[in-house]
Amino acid sequence: MAWATSGHELGHLGLQELIHRHMPLITNAHYWLHLGANLGGAGTLTLRVRAVDTIEAQRMRDLLVAEGYPAQHILVEPGNTISGEGHDLMHLGAKVLSLAGSNRHFHAASDRWPANVNAPGVASIARAVARWIALQAG
């Protein structure tokens, strides 16, 4: 199952609706994958990997490196630093893996294709995420 929500700009309205209508989906899900802001931005390659389970965070890091993302730019951080919708889900008891990038142009008119998109980075992230999902599915 996939669920897309609005971000902090709109107060996580989509997530709030999901919580209100389907709370068991939050806590009974095998895992929640939070694809946070700025994935694949060209200004900086910093990519934060955070999870409530450090084994899953390390697994994602390894997958990212295997798919060509530069290891020196991947920061594995504690689960308690998960932000955005992932933060909200974690505090409701969900198991969360979160990826978030960095971007000097965040919320600026200059934050667009092609100048501020790292296409190879996006491709590496997409392949790693697909592999992680396949591993979770068994």
Summary of predicted features, one role per range:
Residues 6-103:
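Metal-dependent peptidase/peptidase-like ectodomains
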Residues 1, 105-138:
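His/Asp/Glu-rich mid-to-C-terminal helical/loop segments that flank catalytic regions of hydrolases
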